[in-house]
């Protein structure tokens, strides 16, 4: 029977499970182990759920992150693409995550450990100038694109064209009924823009590892996975398609069927990239709420091969983001 959890509920349940297995470690040993290998985190935000700068820096340090890529929000505008201002890219009940300017200034001040992305509401008239302003300043990615638009709309395609011109990847949040519509026809964009590196993220991206996932409204399914879903095919068939392992959705994909997850990570070891996208202040597995830390632990458990781990945690990000 398929179950449907919210992101917060899932992470809490997964945290309890992981903390109760061999992955459970104390604070000292956890941090010590993570210092042994470099990790690039391709998915974080400033001001995420009211977490301040010092707390975010401490969180990344606790996870053992060498380099963090910060993804900005779009502007708070009252358009259909932002659900009339409710979701301009990243709004929660605690407020809005940092936009382009704030994210750029933070990364500039902490350039040793942080990089930044560029973002804009795609149907705003100045979307491309806004994005290109920050690409010229050194943004390494466009995204996270998290808007109520068709994936093949004119505005989105202009963004893909900018990504091609500046040779940066595009990171997209796929969520049925909310963000980036048309997942099943996205292959047309992959074919139209073969030089653009697209990175899939979030619930709809990860539920579709399963060939038999039919109810797209179920965002955190449990139980066995049948290989050959749309996501699996996109990664297999298109050299320019990559996957972001972050958040509760990525963690769910790894824990719901560990036998499948092991094979999936090995099969797509050159296409999957670690990200955290967690809003907690801990950064530790033992907290039970940090999806980023739980992701790291689960990946290490599933693929003990250090060469594959290095690809997932470091080399793929370094290559795709050119950092």
Residue ranges of each PLM-predicted region?
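Divalent metal-dependent hydrolysis catalytic cores, especially in the metallo-beta-lactamase
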Residues: 41, 56-86, 114-119, 139-144
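Active-site environment of divalent metal-dependent phosphoester hydrolases
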Residues: 47-49, 75-78, 122-126, 149-152, ...
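Mid-to-C-terminal alpha-helical segments outside catalytic/metal-binding sites
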Residues: 2-42, 51-74, 132, 269-273, ...
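Catalytic pocket-lining loop regions of alpha/beta-barrel enzymes
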Residues: 140-141, 153-274
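Active-site neighborhood of phospho(di)ester-bond hydrolases with catalytic His/Asp-centered motifs
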Residues: 40-42, 70-71, 117-119, 143, ...
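Active-site gating/metal-coordination segments in enzymes
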Residues: 83-179, 247
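Short, flexible/disordered intra-domain loops and linkers
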Residues: 75-95, 207-225, 251-255, 282-290
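Mobile, glycine- and charge-enriched loop segments
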Residues: 32-49, 100-119, 239-242
